[in-house]
Every structure is written in structure tokens, then in C-alpha cells.
Amino acid sequence: MTPPGGAARVAAVPPATAPRASVSVPVRGPLPSTEDLAATQTSYDTVAGSYAALLEDELDARPVDRGLLAAFAETATTAGLGPVGDLGCGPGRVTGHLASLGVDAFGVDLSPGMVAEARRRHPDLRFEVGSILDLDLPDGYLGGALLWYSTVHTPPAQLPEVFAEVHRVLAPGAPLITAFKVGDRQVHLQHAYGHNLSLQVYWTPMELVTDLLDQAGLVIDARMVCEPAPHEKQPQGYVMAHRPA
């Protein structure tokens, strides 16, 4: 799900062969408690309708996002290794976009309210309640996985667990694309989308994300950082990877 703050659009693409800087932020810090996860779920249940209405047409003004999603869709459909999971799908906005590109896509989200909104808006697609930490999917089931700002409420210390689970459910050769906030900070939101809520939001260094994906056994294919748009405060990061065959 896209968190409060949106996504930036001015692309800066480092060469694929450029060496990576060393990771400046170790994977440390507390893991989320049961109460933290419940607060995230409840918050998105509360804002589901407002969130879906506000972001319904967001991709129309996001050519970079559409281009990256098109590249991912082409990779997944060409490989033809199975259905594509939009993991942390929110109200199904990106799931529906992938389906419009010919992808056999379905969505999973922690929030029952978001899943209900997704089913209402996209009755022809499948959406299920579930956690990206423990997906109810067989090993190697997915022909592609999307983590579109799905980890912004996940502390860095828990990212290895998320990426290991994604590796488990991806078929050998299947692609992954992830989008996230780039940086080294966290904030606690108490109001967004016209509602009171409780959400912890994390910014993560690009080098940390790519290193952790690599450690999970995934091969990095491309990475990109977009500078903040005028109304935004942080860069956005995108990584495409795949599980090796």
C-alpha cells in the first residue's frame, strides 16, 4: 500500500554496474509486537474507504511507476511461471493495473477492510487477508511478486524475514519488484486520510534493501531512486529482482 506522503517522480538511475556503497544502517532494532501489527491492521481498516478514494487515479499521474510496472508485467507474463501476488495490495489499485496489462494477478493484505474495498472495486479479481510474513501459499507458487510500499510499516530488523518468505513463494526464475521510502528514519503517524490512527512508517537505505534481498537468495536486476516531487519530503526507491532458476 502507498503510505501517506505518496511517491516521487524525478528519476535518477545509477548505472547497473556501479559498485554499491557499504550499508550504513545495520539491521537492528525491535521487532514489531502483536500490538503493533494489530494497530497497523486497525488503522488501515479505519481509513480503507478514504484511502481508496483518494488514491484511485494516482497511477494516471505516475509515468515512472507505470513504466516500472509495465516492465515487471512483461517479465512475469513472458516467464509464465504462475500467478502474480500483489503482497500488501491495499484496495487493489495496483493489482487491477497489473490485470489490465494481462497479468494473472491477485492481492493479499493484512487489513480486512482493505481487502473488502479491493473486492468491491475489483470484483473480477481475487483478494485474500494475509500477512507478508506468513503467506498461505505453497513453495514456488508465484510467477511474480509485488511489494509496492508494502514494507514501509516493517522495521528494518524484520525485512530479512519478509524477503525470505517472498523467496519461498516465488517460483525459480520469477521476478519481484519492490517500492519503498529511501532514507534512515521513522515516524509515528497519528492522523492521516481524515482519520485518527496509529502507524509506524520506516525509511530504508537503498543499499540495505538490495543487500537483504541478496542475502535472501534473490538476484538484483535493477534499482532506481526518484528524487522527491515538490509536495514530497523523501526519495522513493524501486528494486527489480528475481529468484534464480
Predicted region positions:
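Conserved beta-strand signature within the Rossmann-like core of class I S-adenosyl-L-methionine
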Residues: 173-180
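A short glycine-rich, Lys/Arg-flanked "PGG" loop and its adjoining helix->strand segment in the class I
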Residues: 160-172
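Conserved class I S-adenosyl-L-methionine
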Residues: 25-79, 184
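A short acidic, Gly/Pro-enriched loop at the edge of an enzyme's catalytic core
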Residues: 133-145
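Core SAM-dependent methyltransferase catalytic element
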Residues: 228-245
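Class I SAM-dependent methyltransferase SAM/SAH-binding core
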Residues: 82-87, 91-134
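Short alpha-helix
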Residues: 201-216
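Short, glycine-/aromatic-enriched active-site segment of Class I SAM-dependent methyltransferases
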Residues: 182-200
